[in-house]
């Protein structure tokens, strides 16, 4: 049984929040958890706040970078692997959990080179480069979506925070809301999305005043003042926050969500049981957000809207039809809940410990 686990996850909430769910499960079992991440990502705030020691690697991703960065990649990777080996030795972890993203590659190679147990979790429907390269070296490979094509992969879903997994069923949450304005949750991912911010304000402003929903909007820290000003100028009341810390409360409150289609977001929508209009980030690597959104649409839990060509008038028409339709909101929410795999954190934690999950 592993006495300590080193988790490799960084950059954005899509990697960090599922990793935090596993870290919390391991800590509850009495396992020491260390974290290896980047020096610039959200983990710098979220991981210490959760009480886990954070070690930063000096490494940056390669996708979308110039040819000079690619030419220097072997040297940069070798240096990062040596760094990761030192961190792994110093913290004494016997297993490494790679959650994808470029920080996972050196951490995974360090684990393999030192003979430590390597486990991987791929959050997206289309696997990222790091997990594709590391999968043959891993003892266990887990995925958030079925049919990813990774060798040895077991579909367990994406780990979600316990507070979200434990929310009441949609029918219980929605009971008694008939006759009230619909509750619309807007999320542009952990860092916000200006396109979604702009679209939603314009779309809601065009609705008749009596048809407008109550709004809770996560807009990203870079867009907070502009988004608040846009709602005020449009005469639309809204609760606007840079980042929603209590996501379980937001999901419990909502009747419908408009959001990006990152893997962590999709997993949390399913765990909570909440229907959605998903607008995939069009520049995501391998267009993986579109694949994530297609899963939701195909299972009857929402609709995918392509950002290209999407106009506020189209969104207004959709909202005009969706917001008063309590029956459809419940059907979408229940379909989402049926896709939930709420034991993912337990399964992955057991694998990190070298156990089979009962």
Residue ranges of model-derived segments:
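Acidic donor-binding loop of glycosyltransferase active sites
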Residues: 93-94, 252-266, 274-275
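C-terminal alpha-helical cap of glycosyltransferases
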Residues: 341-358
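Short amphipathic alpha-helix
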Residues: 15-26
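Glycosyltransferases and closely related glycan-assembly transferases
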Residues: 83-97, 103-119, 132-137
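A short, well-ordered alpha-helix in the C-terminal region of glycosyltransferases
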Residues: 328-342
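Active-site-proximal region of nucleotide-activated glycan assembly enzymes
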Residues: 32, 42, 53, 112-170
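Conserved nucleotide-sugar phosphate-binding/catalytic loop shared by glycosyltransferases and other
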Residues: 4-9, 29-79, 221-223, 308
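Donor-nucleotide binding loops and adjacent catalytic segments primarily
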Residues: 41, 46, 50, 169-257, ...
């Amino acid at each position: 049984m592993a006495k300590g686990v080193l988790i490799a996850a960084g950059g954005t909430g899509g990697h960090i929040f599922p990793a935090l769910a596993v870290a919390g499960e391991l800590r509850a079992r009495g396992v020491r958890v260390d974290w290896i991440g980047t020096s610039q990502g959200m983990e710098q705030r979220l991981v210490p706040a959760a009480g886990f020691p954070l070690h930063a690697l000096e490494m940056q991703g390669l996708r979308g970078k110039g040819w000079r960065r690619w030419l220097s990649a072997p040297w940069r990777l070798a240096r990062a692997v040596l760094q990761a080996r030192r961190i792994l030795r110093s913290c004494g972890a016997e297993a490494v959990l790679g959650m994808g993203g470029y920080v996972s590659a050196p951490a995974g190679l360090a684990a393999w080179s030192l003979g430590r147990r390597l486990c991987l979790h791929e959050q997206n429907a289309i696997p990222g480069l790091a997990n594709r390269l590391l999968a043959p070296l891993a003892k266990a490979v887990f995925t958030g979506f079925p049919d990813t094509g990774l060798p040895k992969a077991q579909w367990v879903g994406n780990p979600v925070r316990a507070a979200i997994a434990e929310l009441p069923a949609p029918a219980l949450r929605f009971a008694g809301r008939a006759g009230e304005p619909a509750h619309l949750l807007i999320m542009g991912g952990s860092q916000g999305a200006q396109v979604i911010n702009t679209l939603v304000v314009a779309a809601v402003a065009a609705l008749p005043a009596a048809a407008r929903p109550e709004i809770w909007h996560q807009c990203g820290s870079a867009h907070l003042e502009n988004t608040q000003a846009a709602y005020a100028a449009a005469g639309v009341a809204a609760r606007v926050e840079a980042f929603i810390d209590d996501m379980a409360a937001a999901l419990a409150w909502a009747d419908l969500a408009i959001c990006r289609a990152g893997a962590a977001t999709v997993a949390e929508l399913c765990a909570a049981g909440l229907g959605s209009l998903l607008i995939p980030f069009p520049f995501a690597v391998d267009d993986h957000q579109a694949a994530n959104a297609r899963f939701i649409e195909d299972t009857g839990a929402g609709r995918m809207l392509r950002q290209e060509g999407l106009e506020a008038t189209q969104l207004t028409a959709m909202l005009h039809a969706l917001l008063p339709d309590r029956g459809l909101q419940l059907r979408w929410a229940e379909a989402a809940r049926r896709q939930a795999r709420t034991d993912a954190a337990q399964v992955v934690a057991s694998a990190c410990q070298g156990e089979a999950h009962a």
